Regions:
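Short, acidic, small-residue-rich periplasmic hinge/interaction motif at the N-terminus
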Residues: 37-41, 75-77, 94-135, 155-157, ...
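Short, acidic Ser/Thr/Gly-rich low-complexity loop/linker segments typical of extracellular
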Residues: 43-59
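N-terminal periplasmic accessory domains that precede
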Residues: 94-100, 142-145, 183-184, 198, ...
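Short acidic/polar hinge/loop motifs at secondary-structure boundaries
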Residues: 142, 148, 175-205
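Extracytoplasmic beta-strand/coil segments of soluble accessory domains associated
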Residues: 143-177, 206, 213
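Outer membrane beta-barrel strand-and-loop segments of large Gram-negative receptors
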Residues: 436-438, 481-487, 591-593, 597, ...
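Surface-exposed extracellular loop regions of Gram-negative outer-membrane beta-barrel proteins
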Residues: 522-524, 557-603, 624-645, 725, ...
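C-terminal beta-signal and adjacent terminal beta-strands/loops
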Residues: 627-628, 744-820
Length: 820
């Protein structure tokens, strides 16, 4: 049928008055190249007749061509220009050049040059980064991969931020994922990733979740039939610095992928295990003022992490016809992350009244705090795609997830130095199973050769129940008893209906799109304590529009500019709405706000990209973000020695910044990528009937520099830096990490060995260390310096035992990972 339509199209095209040339441009991995430049020249004179850029499907067309002999060139940033010669036009003919494949790098006749892909590819709505460029993340997780991107930072607590915002959404192969970002980023092996797309101003066909935009993780795939198998091993050397930790920390892992592909079937099987412990310590001080009494308790001790992940993945894809595709996938896994804080509180004292010399000394004590977070899950998805006769595409997808979240927290205050003395023993659980359903139907068709329209409907259902039991005792020989005021049942039900339309078109060097998404959300939060004093249901419902628009203009082969707008939402998690306190550790209770509103965001950005000599490139993006109902974690005084950490809507914020990146090729062997972000953050609002006002300039820098000794050996240095940052109630200090990676391949690139030196310090720097301070005048002051393990040595081995092309596609969690 498609062949018949193509013949009919050619027939009617011939009836036109003038001749045409049509074709399609893709890369060597069969990815269609949007915005590739195609130029038409007269054969004899080499005069340029005209130029066009490809549309979203890589198609191009030249109209009204006079009779004569011509040739064309097709080019795209980071790829070798390709020339098609001896194109003869006569008698109002249509010439179909078919698929033009561009290869990376540059090759000269009889000269061998090691070609490298550009680190970044800019498109109208996204930046694309190739994972192979970031060797320091080899054998690790996706989290270590994305920290190399401009404007992406990870602080000492493992929190990921994009352009200064911790709110963003994750896509896997274009499929949205709702869940704790740290979980998805820790679970997926970096070896399975082909590239990462940074979508800062998403269109209406994407979910509006995530105030900083979307990060789309694309797993490796290929187009060659056959079998592909790869296994990766990872092992860590013993820790150089012990930090006084009670036991040794282990780091090891393995992951594998096996893929079989033929004309109709694509079957993938994968699994991984990763143990990723981290040693460290913390030094802190807390002071409070309550009832004219000043209390002070400094502390010091171990803060370490034991983390282990297991998962297995299976996907089967069936294409009975070229226009029909059906896929079914399953994903199951277990995750456990234990945070141990064994802290000595020493030199504790109080002064009463405040400002006097009446100082009373407290006893010193030892706090053993073990907080474990578990996440056992299983999910499945079904996808169906059908291409109609008019080349329009109908897609249907269904995803269901069950996740059991939980893990106890143990908090013991013991004697010091005699730890056999028990002052208080607390044990609280937070088992909270989650059920998620997502279904989507969308339809895409071409209005004409250069115009496309997308329409769709989506339904999401979340049922998240929690049973939180808080127990206490004062003697090891006594049983625990229930603390009813801290024990509760919390149930969140959320239903979302969404409709969207997206219009995109292209004319000559100008491309633009506009879209609108309408969303109706219903949220029910059921709260019940075990003291039988609270039993209520809180509702929050709304219907809202999310418009988006983008425009890009290609000035010439080297320069393009773009402008984009997007309206977003950052939804609140169940954890942040749970109003019942949870004992995080001896000096902190943590609780949420049941009336917490989502954040609503308007973002606009202007981008510029310039191709320079020697394949060097420069890009820059100026952005502005306005956020309503900003959610911050703020502190109040609970009692003389405990602070209450609360999540609350504290006001509105404005962020204006600029993001800059550059591909720098110093020589054929030395290539660097540098990216930076600087922005001004202004927050105005109030909390607890007190005004909040903070304004600061924050910047970050990511550097990646690679030197190739030979075609099969290279050395890479990376450096990630985050400046001081003003918060709603204090300041986070600077945070940085340098890394060095040596890589060597053998056996015709089938065996790859990587030696990594992570968090370089040598006792000379303050790598992997950050101080976090919060205060409220005349009420409290707290500062904690987190010092984590440095000079970590890792060895990775990767072996391809079936040398076909990897076409694996796996699914990921949609709901549970946001709550982990």
């Amino acid at each position: 049928m498609k062949s018949s339509l193509h013949i009919i199209f050619i027939f009617f095209s011939i009836l036109k008055i003038n001749s045409q040339i049509i074709g399609n441009v893709s890369d060597d991995l069969d990815n269609k190249l949007e915005y590739a430049t195609v130029v038409l020249f007269e054969q004899n004179s080499n005069n340029q007749i005209g130029g066009v850029i490809t549309n979203i499907d890589g198609d191009f067309k030249f109209n009204n061509i006079k009779d004569g002999n011509y040739y064309i060139t097709a080019s795209f940033l980071g790829y070798k220009t390709k020339k098609i010669s001896e194109i003869k036009i006569m008698d109002n003919i249509l010439i179909d050049l078919g698929n033009i494949i561009l290869e990376i790098g540059n090759n000269l006749d009889e000269v061998v040059i090691t070609a490298q892909r550009s680190t970044i590819i800019n498109k109208i709505d996204r930046q694309i980064y190739k994972s192979e460029m970031f060797k320091s993340a080899r054998g690790s997780s996706v989290k270590d991969l994305i920290r190399q991107l401009p404007s992406v930072n990870i602080n000492s607590l493992g929190e990921v931020s994009v352009r200064g915002s911790k709110g963003f959404s994750i896509l896997l192969n274009g499929n949205p994922i709702q869940g704790a970002m740290s979980t998805i980023l820790d679970q997926l092996p970096s070896n399975a990733v082909e590239s990462i797309e940074f979508i800062t101003a998403p269109s209406a066909k994407f979910d509006p979740d995530g105030k900083a935009g979307l990060i789309n993780i694309l797993t490796k795939k290929g187009a060659i039939q056959g079998a592909y198998g790869q296994i990766n091993l990872k092992s860590g050397f013993p820790s150089i610095e012990k930090y006084g930790n009670d036991k040794n920390h282990n780091r090891f892992g393995s992951d594998f992928t096996y893929n079989i592909t033929n004309e109709k079937w694509n079957i993938s099987l994968g699994g991984s295990v990763l143990r990723n412990d981290l040693g460290g310590r913390r030094e802190g001080e807390v002071s409070t003022i309550i009832d004219d009494v000043y209390n002070n308790f400094p502390s010091s001790g171990e803060r370490s992490f034991d983390e282990i992940n297991f998962n297995g993945r299976f996907t089967i894809e069936y294409s009975p016809k070229s226009y029909e595709n059906l896929s079914l996938g399953f994903f199951a896994g277990k995750r456990s992350k234990k945070r141990l804080a064994d802290i000595v509180y020493y030199d504790n004292y109080r002064i009463s009244p405040v400002g006097s010399n009446n100082k009373t000394q407290y006893i010193s004590y030892f706090n053993h705090n073990l907080r474990e977070r578990k996440g056992d899950f299983i999910l499945g998805n079904l996808n169906y795609s059908y291409t109609l006769n008019n080349k329009s595409i109908l897609n249907f997808s269904l995803l269901y997830e069950y996740t059991l979240l939980g893990g106890p927290t143990i908090n013991q205050n013991l004697g010091y130095p005699d730890n056999s003395i028990l002052y208080q023993d607390e044990y609280n659980t937070n088992d909270n199973p989650l059920f998620g359903l997502r279904t989507q139907l969308d339809y895409s068709f071409d209005v004409n050769k250069n115009t496309k329209l997308d329409l769709g409907y989506q339904y999401r259902d979340l049922d998240h129940t929690g049973d939180f039991v808080y127990q206490r005792r004062y003697n090891f020989n006594d049983p625990f008893y229930l603390v009813p005021e801290f024990s509760s049942e919390v149930n969140l039900k959320r239903k979302i209906h969404s409709f969207f339309s997206q219009f995109s078109t292209q004319k000559d060097n100008l491309s633009y799109s506009a879209g609108l998404r309408i969303e109706s959300m219903k949220r029910d939060l059921l709260l019940k304590d075990k003291a039988n004093t609270i039993d209520e249901s809180l509702q929050y419902n709304f219907t809202k529009l999310y418009p988006s628009a983008s425009i890009q203009y290609v000035l010439n082969d080297e320069t393009k500019i773009k402008l984009a707008y997007s309206k977003r939402i950052e939804r609140t998690t169940t954890f942040k709405m749970n109003p019942f306190p949870e004992r995080e550790h001896t000096e902190t209770l943590e609780q949420g706000d049941p009336n917490l509103k989502p954040e609503f965001i308007d973002q606009i950005e202007i981008g510029f990209e310039k191709k320079l000599n020697n394949n060097n490139r420069l890009f820059s993006t100026l952005y502005f973000r306005n956020t309503k109902n900003v959610v911050n974690r703020v502190n109040t005084v609970y009692n003389d020695s405990v602070l209450n950490r609360i999540y609350s809507n504290v006001g509105n914020s404005k962020t204006i910044g600029v993001e800059i990146g550059a591909d720098i090729n110093k020589s054929k062997k030395w290539k660097s990528f540098v990216g930076g972000n600087i922005y001004n953050y202004d927050l105005k609002g109030s909390f607890d009937n007190r005004p909040i006002s903070s304004n600061s300039i924050i910047y970050s820098l990511n550097l990646n520099s690679t030197y190739r000794f030979w075609d099969d050996a290279s050395l890479q240095f990376t450096f990630n830096y985050l400046s001081d940052r003003i918060t709603a109630q204090g300041e986070d200090s600077r945070y940085y990490n340098p890394n060095l990676t040596l890589e060597k391949t053998f056996l015709d690139n089938r065996l790859k060995i990587t030696l990594q030196w992570l968090n370089i310090d040598l006792g000379l720097l303050k790598s992997n260390e950050q101080r976090i301070t919060t205060f409220r005048k005349d009420e409290f002051y707290t500062t904690t310096n987190y010092i984590y393990e440095v000079d970590i040595i890792m060895l990775n081995l990767s072996y391809i035992f079936k040398n076909g092309k990897n076409k694996s596609k796996f699914i990921e969690s949609e709901f549970g990972k946001r709550e982990f």
